[in-house]
């Protein structure tokens, strides 16, 4: 392996029973105000050819702990749009502990949160070929202290936020995606990327205390409901086009 290697193996997957909005396995969606009201809402893991469900009704679900781990040269594509990231979490609950995690040269996303309520502290994503941090399926995440650096030859958004994401998911499916990122440095070097942060589908985003250095635009907010859902952008300095 060298500094441009990726897709040498699959990646790390953590699944749990915390709520997700996109029940693409059971199609039993939750549209009530209580995100824990629907234990039958399950989704199917990407990047695998066998049925691998996740999601449920336990926001505090515990999938264990990962601390001081480097995930290098990872990523696997089962088919177009069906891939494994360096770190994939699905319905992973807040009882799970993720600290001091590094993704290096993933062939897809660095980290993708499919629903769940897991938080992560001290995250570095270097050289992801797609999005560095991707969150969807109603994920409720706090990212505390993050460094993202793209390669020049590959990479899409630093953050991509969707809510809801699936084509069969109703727009009012609960939970709605919410992501909080505090203390961060984003360096967008990719010639293929058009924005640093992309949010859509009425997902809610908060960015505080950060620096953005980019070739292109800092923010792309799709649709009026997504702009209305924006929580805050506070104490963020950006050098963008």
Predicted features along the sequence, with ranges:
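Extracellular beta-rich repeat passengers
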Residues: 1-129, 134-241
């Amino acid at each position: 392996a060298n500094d441009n290697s990726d897709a040498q193996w699959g990646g790390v997957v953590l699944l749990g029973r915390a709520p997700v909005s996109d029940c693409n396995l059971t199609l039993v969606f939750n549209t009530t105000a209580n995100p824990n009201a629907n234990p039958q809402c399950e989704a199917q893991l990407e990047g695998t050819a066998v049925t691998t469900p996740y999601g449920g009704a336990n926001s505090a679900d515990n999938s264990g702990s990962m601390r001081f781990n480097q995930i290098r040269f990872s990523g696997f594509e089962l088919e177009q749009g069906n891939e494994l990231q360096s770190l994939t979490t699905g319905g992973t609950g807040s009882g799970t502990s993720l600290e001091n995690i590094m993704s290096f040269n993933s062939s897809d996303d660095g980290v993708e949160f499919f629903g769940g309520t897991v938080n992560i502290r001290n995250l570095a994503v270097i050289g992801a070929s797609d999005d560095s941090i991707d969150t969807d399926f109603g994920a409720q995440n706090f990212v505390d202290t993050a460094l993202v650096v793209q390669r020049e030859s590959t990479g899409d958004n630093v953050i991509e936020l969707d809510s809801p994401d699936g084509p069969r998911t109703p727009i009012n499916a609960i939970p709605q995606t919410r992501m909080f990122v505090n203390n961060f440095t984003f360096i967008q070097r990719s010639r293929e990327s058009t924005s640093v942060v992309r949010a859509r589908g009425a997902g809610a985003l908060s960015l505080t205390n950060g620096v953005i250095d980019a070739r292109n635009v800092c923010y792309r907010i799709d649709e009026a409901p997504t702009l209305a859902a924006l929580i805050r952008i506070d104490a963020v300095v950006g050098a963008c086009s």
